[in-house]
A protein has these predicted regions:
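Conserved MFS/SLC helix-loop-helix module at the cytosolic interface between two early adjacent transmembrane helices
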Residues: 46-84
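Residue-level signature of mid-helix packing/kink "hotspots" within the transmembrane helices
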Residues: 13, 41-49, 133-134
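A generic transmembrane-helix signature of 12-TM secondary carrier transporters
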Residues: 68, 72-75, 90-91, 157-164
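Helix-loop-helix hairpin linking two adjacent transmembrane segments in secondary transporters
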Residues: 86, 123-168
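Cytoplasmic helix-loop-helix junction between adjacent transmembrane helices
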Residues: 90-128
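Extracytoplasmic
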Residues: 3-30, 51
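Helix-loop junctions on the cytosolic side of multi-pass membrane transporters
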Residues: 167-180
Length: 195
């Protein structure tokens, strides 16, 4: 669950040291290259808003697993990218996949752990969410010291594979049926609070 909650920070911050290299590799202006981050964040935000609703309807664990498969596919597409458009398509897939992690990992924790264990689990998830943005750029720079820029996306792909292997199924979590009222969570108050 900690890995699931951390994937968005990893995907956002690990590529920061790569941006100048991407500009040279694709012979593009810097504003276009910055779409790899700004575009990611826009799609990621929309994905977060929808993932909780979809998770309630289809099952949180199922949606979380599907989202990491999307993130894996996006990471591999970025790894193989030979054009900026291919890279941006991969980043879009990554963003859609990353959106479910922070939302559903906490929801699954609440359904899986006892109240005492839940406090510890949520504390660990929050700590990881704070630490990963600090470590990710350093990890990206370290990778660039030995490998080419696209290997950063291979590391992200491996991260998603590890997260899938450490699925919450191992915690004994089973998706529960959604309450009938869960489909009505998008209310005027919700929209006003979001804005």
């Amino acid at each position: 669950l900690i890995l699931a909650a951390s994937v968005s920070a990893l995907a956002t911050d690990m590529i920061v040291p790569v941006l100048p290299l991407l500009q040279k590799a694709f012979h593009s202006d810097y504003s276009s290259i910055q779409l790899t981050i700004s575009g990611f964040l826009v799609i990621y935000a929309c994905s977060q808003l929808l993932s909780g609703f979809i998770g309630e309807k289809l099952g949180k664990l199922r949606v979380l697993t599907a989202s990491f498969l999307l993130f894996l596919a996006g990471s591999l597409l970025c790894f193989m990218a030979d054009s900026l458009s291919m890279l941006l398509a991969g980043r879009a897939l990554q963003a859609v996949g990353a959106g479910a992690g922070p939302v559903l990992s906490k929801a699954i924790a609440k359904e899986t752990f006892s109240p005492l264990t839940l406090k510890r689990a949520l504390s660990d998830i929050s700590s990881a969410s704070a630490v990963v943005p600090l470590i990710a750029p350093l990890a990206g720079a370290a990778i660039l010291g030995h490998l080419s820029w696209n290997h950063i996306f291979l590391v992200m792909a491996l991260f998603s594979v590890v997260t899938l292997l450490l699925s919450p199924r191992r915690l004994g979590h089973r998706d529960s049926a959604a309450a009938p009222s869960s489909s009505l969570f998008i209310t005027p108050a919700f929209i006003q609070g979001t804005l």
